[in-house]
């Protein structure tokens, strides 16, 4: 006997409890074929699902077969084009470009790894998301393009070999929310959410709950919609000729120079940062850029290539909504709820935790250096560039360009930049987020900020800022750097804060 509840502390699952009306014991599933034995020994099968015979085990020779999730048009010497649904055999699997052979044409070449999925597995299913966290499942389902009933199945974070169902729902009090169900495994290979009905495979489970909600918060409507992935950068293209870039639209100007939207080789949309001549040594920049390109994380803007002759160009991935400080002031940014604002802060903390783990330093962390995608994903830009600037207006604390209001006291006074001075800056960035881009220390000049900080002053709590969030800011502004929290701690607190404000899920009926 036993119930279907999850007791794992990390997961807020919908409870999967069904109790027999006669004996009042929890109902226990007995097999994985969609059947359930009851007292008179009769068999119950789900009338909403078409059951299929079990598939024979795949041949080891099929392990290197993949299916194209998207069509791909070749654009380099040596890459291989293919159509959506085409099968290919992987010949070499290394980096982000895999050598493959098309089973349709017999041709060989390199293919982008993120355009294909392993054949004879769950990966080609539009509703299956491999290696997706609970938090990222919520972000994806709440992104534009998804609606009530949009869903996905992902691998469980807490239990290896298990799965979770995440569904977008509407709550009268909270609005659009995502609810999670633990998909439980049977000993003989079947699955169930509610022990009233079991399934031989996830396909049958999805078909059943697409036909009827049957105790879930809503009927499953369609798989979570995602954008076609951007193909990886061609690995040999690092120092590129200036003529390979076409600058199309000037997006803005910052401390280091201008930023443009453009195209590389006429087909790849990129952002191009053009650095002011004399702003930094080309040799020092190239050395730093070689370090920066090793820092690859979903919360960091990807560095693709460089032009090392002055004016120096930095070519990165393009982020449709521009800088966070500007986006927060747009009509779309102003409408963001506190939950979404906190989620953006959690994303930034996640990226900075990666920088922290790699023993790197940003040195110029603020909302102007955070970029926002069209799905409201936040990524950190310009990490490491600040220390290369050779402009006295930027490097001296009296300089007009020095970001005094974001800089920790020890960095202002002694030039001591560490990951803990980045933590101070993150606390200031939090004020930018909750005020939708307001300049910190409103009404104060830079000299006044320095004088007040030396007297122990700290920025007051902004309007509409939760007290718990303000206390987190104050932790970031501790006088002694070693007393400030880690970015990993900040990430966990912000993610927990975001989850806690969603409220508790109701038990499944």
Curated annotation (Swiss-Prot):
Annotated region (Interactions with CD4 and CD8), positions in chain: 2-72
The gene from which this protein is expressed is LCK
Its record classes its membrane topology as: Lipid-anchor
Q: Which UniProt keywords apply?
A: ATP-binding, Cell membrane, Chromosomal rearrangement, Cytoplasm, Disease variant, Host-virus interaction, Isopeptide bond, Kinase, Lipoprotein, Membrane, Myristate, Nucleotide-binding, Palmitate, Phosphoprotein, Proto-oncogene, SH2 domain, SH3 domain, Transferase, Tyrosine-protein kinase, Ubl conjugation
- Which residue(s) hold a covalent lipid per the annotation (S-palmitoyl cysteine)? 3, 5
Protein name as it appears in the record: Tyrosine-protein kinase Lck
List residues modified as Phosphotyrosine: 192, 394, 505
Indicate the segments forming the Protein kinase domain, all copies. Answer: 245-498
Activity modulation: The relative activities of the inhibitory tyrosine-protein kinase CSK and the activating tyrosine-protein phosphatase PTPRC/CD45 determine the level of LCK activity. These interactions allow rapid and efficient activation of LCK in response to TCR stimulation.
- An example Gene Ontology cellular component term from the record? cytosol
Positions carrying Phosphoserine: 102, 162, 194
At which residues is a lipid of type N-myristoyl glycine covalently attached?
2
Q: Which disease is it linked to?
A: A chromosomal aberration involving LCK is found in leukemias. Translocation t(1;7)(p34;q34) with TCRB. Immunodeficiency 22: A primary immunodeficiency characterized by T-cell dysfunction. Affected individuals present with lymphopenia, recurrent infections, severe diarrhea, and failure to thrive.
Which top EC class applies here? Answer: transferase
Q: Which residues form the active site?
A: 364
Species this protein is from: Homo sapiens (Human)
The record gives the effect of mutating residue 447 to L as:
Found in leukemia
Q: Does the keyword Cytoplasm apply?
A: yes
* Function per UniProt: Non-receptor tyrosine-protein kinase that plays an essential role in the selection and maturation of developing T-cells in the thymus and in the function of mature T-cells. Plays a key role in T-cell antigen receptor (TCR)-linked signal transduction pathways. Constitutively associated with the cytoplasmic portions of the CD4 and CD8 surface receptors.
Where along this sequence does the record place binding of ATP?
A: 251-259, 273
Say if the entry is tagged with keyword Signal: no
* Compartments where located: Cell membrane; Cytoplasm, Cytosol
UniProt-listed GO biological process terms: B cell receptor signaling pathway; CD27 signaling pathway; cell surface receptor protein tyrosine kinase signaling pathway; Fc-gamma receptor signaling pathway; gamma-delta T cell differentiation; hemopoiesis; intracellular signal transduction; intracellular zinc ion homeostasis
The annotated consequence of residue 99 to R reads: Abolishes UBR2-mediated 'Lys-63'-linked ubiquitination. Abolishes UBR2-mediated 'Lys-63'-linked ubiquitination and autophosphorylation of Tyr-394
Q: What does the UniProt record report as the effect of altering residue 394 to F in this chain?
A: Abolishes autophosphorylation
Write out the catalysed reaction: L-tyrosyl-[protein] + ATP = O-phospho-L-tyrosyl-[protein] + ADP + H(+)
